[in-house]
């Protein structure tokens, strides 16, 4: 990591309610430059809500947060200029070609496409999409759409990346290329905030992980730190995740099968 003291994501008591339901409960979180931070949790735990607030797409009910040094509530445009956000599923314009979509993304960020076209070409080649970028997006497979969206996310060289399931729909070779790319970006000082259900990816890529359950951040740390907190010896991240979030164990699964 480039500078472990450069704070790029800072949330204090970040809260979100929808009616009477608390989707996020007083989240405190710090993420640093050059860090790949895994954000993990069961479906409905609050991961997407958190990401949407940190990217300025959803207004918090309470608390505060800053990304890349800018307040998400009072300086959302400055935040958006410095981040890249890959949603799951990604939103693409189907009646544009891949190139036209990337030109549109560059225009949104106020970046002349000529200044980033070489970067776009290199990323397209890395993800093996360069021969199809002239085709309409409506004809793309799920994996091709994911690749194009990722190139768009990286096009303006953002300081902080928010990635929701970045390897979804990718073949093993492309998934490996994406993982290697993210590691290199972190090595160059970028912050990668990664939400994934593939715990093996988080275990092998992330410097630290945060586990959220029912809107509460219940654990934060490196794998070794989480093992120590849970007194779990050499447990895998998957075992720790299931232990902390109350997932079914082997005995419970066997009981269900025997009863059916």
Predicted segments with their positions:
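Conserved ABC ATPase "signature" region
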Residues: 103, 107, 114-132
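A short, proline-enriched helix->beta-strand linker immediately N-terminal to the Walker B motif
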Residues: 155-159
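Catalytic Walker B motif of ABC-type/P-loop ATPase nucleotide-binding domains
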Residues: 161-165
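Helical segment within the ABC ATPase nucleotide-binding domain
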Residues: 175-188
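ABC ATPase "signature
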Residues: 220-221
């Amino acid at each position: 990591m480039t500078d472990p003291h450069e704070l790029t994501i800072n949330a204090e008591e970040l809260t979100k309610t929808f009616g009477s339901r608390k989707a996020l409960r007083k989240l405190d979180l710090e993420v640093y430059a050059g860090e790949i931070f895994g954000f993990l949790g069961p479906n409905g735990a609050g991961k997407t809500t958190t990401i949407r607030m940190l990217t300025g797409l959803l207004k918090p009910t309470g608390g505060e947060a800053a990304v890349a040094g800018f307040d998400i509530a009072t300086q959302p445009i400055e935040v958006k200029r410095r981040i890249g956000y890959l949603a799951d599923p990604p939103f693409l314009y189907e009646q544009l070609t891949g190139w036209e979509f990337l030109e549109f993304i560059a225009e949104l960020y106020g970046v002349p496409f000529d200044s980033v076209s070489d970067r776009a070409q290199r990323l397209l080649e890395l993800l093996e999409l360069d021969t199809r970028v002239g085709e309409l997006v409506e004809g793309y497979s799920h994996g091709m759409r994911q690749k194009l969206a990722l190139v768009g996310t990286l096009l303006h060289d953002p300081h902080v990346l928010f990635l929701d399931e970045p390897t979804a729909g990718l073949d093993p070779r492309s998934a490996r290329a994406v993982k290697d790319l993210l590691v290199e970006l972190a090595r160059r000082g970028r912050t990668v905030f990664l939400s994934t259900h593939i715990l093996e990816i988080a275990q092998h890529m992330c410097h630290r992980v945060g586990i959220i359950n029912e809107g509460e951040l219940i654990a934060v740390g490196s794998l070794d730190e989480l093992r120590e907190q849970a007194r779990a010896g050499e447990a895998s991240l998957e075992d720790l995740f299931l232990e902390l979030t109350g997932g079914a164990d082997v005995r419970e699964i066997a009981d269900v099968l025997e009863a059916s």
